[in-house]
Design a protein with these regions (language model features):
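Flexible, solvent-exposed loop/hinge segments and secondary-structure transition points
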Residues: 13-31
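Hydrophobic alpha-helical segments, chiefly the membrane-spanning helices
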Residues: 11-15, 19, 106, 115
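Glycine-rich phosphate-binding active-site loops on the catalytic face of alpha/beta enzymes
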Residues: 110-130, 167-176, 216-235
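Catalytic cores of alpha/beta
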Residues: 103-115, 150-161, 198, 202-221, ...
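C-terminal helical cap(s) of enzyme catalytic domains, especially alpha/beta-barrels
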Residues: 185-189, 212, 227-248
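N-terminal active-site wall of soluble small-molecule enzyme domains
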Residues: 32-33, 38, 45-146, 152-157, ...
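Catalytic-face loop-and-helix region of soluble metabolic enzyme cores
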Residues: 165-221
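Short, small-residue-biased leader/transition segments that mark boundaries at the very start
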Residues: 1-2
Length: 248
């Protein structure tokens, strides 16, 4: 475990989590719960958005109807920053997810100290004992944990670790190829007590409507929004399109 400073602990203690999972479930009851992702770059696409202003993006996405925000903080592969997380949280009332490769509990304390309300744990990147330990640390800090799985084995591990917010990622981490059908294959394996989140490959309101019909409650969308000239407008159109399809 890395060194935990008193100042970091105090900053974490000062942040009162906003309830990431609760927000998703509340919005999903009557609407379309989108987790809008602030992502400057990615390993597969390179630079996605040169004009990357977290505060402005967060405000626009909240006004457009996002249920929550996801903020990339990994510097090496996504050109992210904890500063982006803090700025997004300060500029919006929405709960924020720290999206990073979290492997040590100090990163959880860092997340809360920088105003995160939830963290991402990638099942494929962790041994089971690590997954269980990090989940417990985050929950003890009052943070929600989005456990990301790519197949049935990883899903079972996430459930065994006590995760109640499950993300199914349709992107293959080895090839970066996206197969949205992966989300449909696994959704029935997720208990109804969990909030089901579909990740990657969502391009249209029709995709959202299909996923909603299959049992998903929330949809993590980043690249298509960040590529748009006005991400807020793009999200508004996406949600409206999904509503039209759902209400047919």
């Amino acid at each position: 475990m890395l060194f935990r400073s008193r100042a970091l602990e105090q900053a974490a203690a000062a942040h009162i989590p906003r309830g990431f999972r609760k927000s998703l479930r509340r919005v999903a009851r009557d609407g379309i719960a989108v987790i809008a992702e602030l992502k400057k770059a990615s390993p597969s696409k390179g630079l996605i958005r040169a004009d990357f202003r977290p505060s402005e993006l967060a405000r626009g996405l909240e006004q457009a109807g996002a249920a929550a925000l996801s903020v990339l903080t990994d510097e090496q592969f996504f050109q992210g920053s904890l500063d982006y997380l803090r700025l997004a949280s300060a500029s919006s009332s929405l709960p924020c997810l720290r999206k990073d490769f979290i492997v040590d509990e100090i990163q959880i304390v860092e997340a809360k100290a920088n105003c995160a309300d939830a963290i991402l744990l990638i099942v494929a990147a962790l041994e089971q004992k690590e997954l269980v330990a990090l989940t417990r640390v985050a929950q003890a800090q009052g943070l929600d944990v989005l456990c990301e799985a790519h197949d049935e084995e990883e899903l079972e591990r996430a459930l065994d670790a006590g995760c109640n917010l499950i993300g199914i990622n349709s992107r293959n981490l080895r090839t970066f190829e996206v197969d949205l059908e992966n989300a449909f294959r696994l959704v029935e394996k997720i208990p109804a007590t969990c909030v089901r989140v579909a990740e990657s490959g969502i391009q249209s309101g029709s995709d959202i409507a299909r996923l909603r019909s299959a049992g998903y409650e929330a949809y993590l969308i980043g690249e298509s929004l960040m590529k748009a000239q006005q991400p807020g407008d793009a999200l508004t159109r996406l949600i409206e399109e999904a509503r039209v399809v759902v209400n047919r």
